[in-house]
């Protein structure tokens, strides 16, 4: 491809900013990134709020309203850190307590914990032996029993691999059925904490591929041992602010792409319903289903993108009374079920060296085939759950209602949705990236941007 091609990147989140970084590294620096909001980072959002230190002093510190953590397999995120000057070396230590709905500690016998650990090890061995290629970034070929893409294992460190493995077709099953098929049902408890509580859905509805590509065996082990997790003192948002600050062409903020015309040789993009710009290539790094509203979708794009679903997930920064302030994050496993959607699943206590501080609650409102819990009802339920935990909320600092985890159903996954979309890459001078093409977390999204550049924008 012509290194001077003018490239339009839609979206200034992790997908878009990392895309520009990797394009630059391959010699493509004639790009423009448009972001409709006034900041970069997308769901990596770390506003500052008042906390009290242990000696009673008030300080402004970052609070995570979206992405919270990473781990040792975040190779693409680490490349972004190095490029932009961010670091996870000084982030606050993670801690957690598994609790009953009333906030009392959830007691597990040593035997029960041992059984859970053994089930995790059993599934980890099975994945390595039977499902080679399951952890490769992206979804190309999975429904046909193939794997192709960067491998995020500690040994491979995003090296490209590809091959055939008919067993990978099992990843189209709901994760609960996948576990049942492999006699590993108890492993669900291990995977549920970092998956369902952070808004990615329930295991009876979500294809196993999403679960296991995000939470491969090594990553799950990292999540179980909180001491290995990465956090950022300046917040996850600082990663993408750093990348943006070091790009040759920083993100153009407050600039919404409101129309796209691909009828000619060039791609004509309209910004904020007024300014028109011509480009040679278009890279979509925002939800593809939204392109149906502002773009000029083909019949194939309409058919495929209309099948994308997403999760109704919101976070709230809340303050309980100072006398009630907890000293650690709480996980409520009893509330991580389809029947308890709309309830508090976890709250994040960010600063262990501080006393009273905003706690961030995480609540999921929908399940495929079930009625959505209305936002106001879920908000009231979440606040009531805090009260039941003996942490009545005195003030809600802010609420972020996220457009979360775009994905496709098990049926559409099995019918080759991803291979159909991947076959469109480059047609009409358009490329597709962002969360739905990999997974809705920082690392998977950045890995996909990295690989898209490798595939189509060679050095």
At which residue positions do the language-model features occur?
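N-terminal Rossmann-like FAD-binding beta1-loop-alpha1 element of flavoenzymes
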Residues: 5-33
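Conserved Rossmann-like nucleotide-cofactor binding loop
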Residues: 15, 39, 289
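Glycine-rich FAD pyrophosphate-binding loop
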Residues: 24-50
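Mid-domain catalytic core of redox enzymes
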Residues: 26, 258-372
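Conserved FAD-binding subdomain of flavin-dependent enzymes
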Residues: 43-46, 52-91
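Mobile amphipathic helical/loop "lid" adjacent to a hydrophobic cofactor/ligand pocket
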Residues: 78, 82-205
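Helical element adjacent to the flavin cofactor pocket in flavoenzyme catalytic cores
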Residues: 216-266
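Conserved flavin/dinucleotide-binding core of flavoenzymes
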Residues: 348-459
């Amino acid at each position: 491809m012509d290194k001077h091609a003018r490239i339009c990147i839609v979206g200034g989140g992790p997908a878009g900013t990392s895309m520009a970084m990797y394009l630059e590294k391959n010699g493509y620096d004639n790009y423009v990134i448009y972001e409709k909001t006034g900041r970069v980072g997308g769901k990596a959002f770390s506003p500052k709020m008042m906390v009290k230190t242990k000696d009673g002093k008030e300080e402004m510190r970052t609070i995570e309203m979206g992405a919270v953590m990473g781990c040792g397999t975040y190779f693409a995120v680490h490349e972004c850190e190095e490029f932009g000057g961010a670091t996870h070396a000084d982030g606050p230590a993670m801690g957690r307590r598994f609790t009953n709905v009333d906030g009392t500690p959830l007691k597990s016998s040593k035997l029960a914990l041992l059984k859970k650990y053994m089930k995790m090890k059993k599934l980890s061995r099975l994945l390595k032996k039977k499902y080679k290629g399951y952890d490769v970034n992206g979804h190309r070929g999975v429904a046909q029993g193939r794997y192709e893409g960067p491998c995020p294992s500690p040994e491979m460190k995003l090296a490209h691999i590809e091959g055939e493995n008919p067993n990978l077709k099992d990843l189209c099953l709901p994760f609960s059925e996948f576990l049942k098929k492999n006699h590993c049902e108890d492993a669900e408890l291990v995977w549920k904490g970092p998956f369902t509580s952070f808004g990615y859905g329930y295991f009876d509805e979500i294809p196993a591929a999403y679960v296991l590509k995000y939470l491969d065996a090594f990553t799950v082990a990292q999540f179980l041992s909180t001491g290995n997790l990465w956090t950022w003192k300046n917040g996850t948002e600082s990663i993408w602010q750093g990348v943006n600050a070091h790009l040759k062409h920083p993100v153009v903020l407050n600039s919404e792409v409101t129309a796209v015309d691909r009828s000619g040789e060039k791609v004509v993009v309209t910004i904020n319903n007024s300014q028109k710009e011509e480009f040679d290539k278009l890279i979509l790094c925002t939800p593809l289903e939204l392109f149906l509203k502002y773009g000029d979708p083909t019949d194939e794009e309409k058919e495929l993108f209309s099948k994308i679903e997403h999760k109704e997930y919101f976070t709230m920064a809340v303050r309980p009374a100072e006398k009630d302030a907890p000293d650690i994050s709480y996980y409520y496993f009893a509330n991580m079920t389809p029947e308890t959607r709309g309830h508090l699943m976890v709250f994040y206590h960010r600063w262990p060296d501080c006393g009273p501080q905003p706690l961030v609650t995480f609540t999921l409102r929908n399940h495929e085939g079930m009625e959505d819990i209305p936002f106001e009802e879920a908000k009231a339920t979440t606040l009531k759950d805090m009260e039941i935990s003996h942490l009545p909320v005195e003030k809600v600092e802010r609420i972020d209602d996220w457009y979360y985890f775009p994905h496709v159903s098990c049926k559409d996954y099995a019918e080759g949705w991803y291979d159909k979309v991947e076959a469109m890459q480059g047609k009409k001078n358009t490329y597709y990236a962002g969360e739905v093409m990999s997974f809705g977390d920082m690392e998977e999204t950045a890995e996909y941007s990295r690989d898209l550049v490798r595939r189509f924008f060679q050095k």
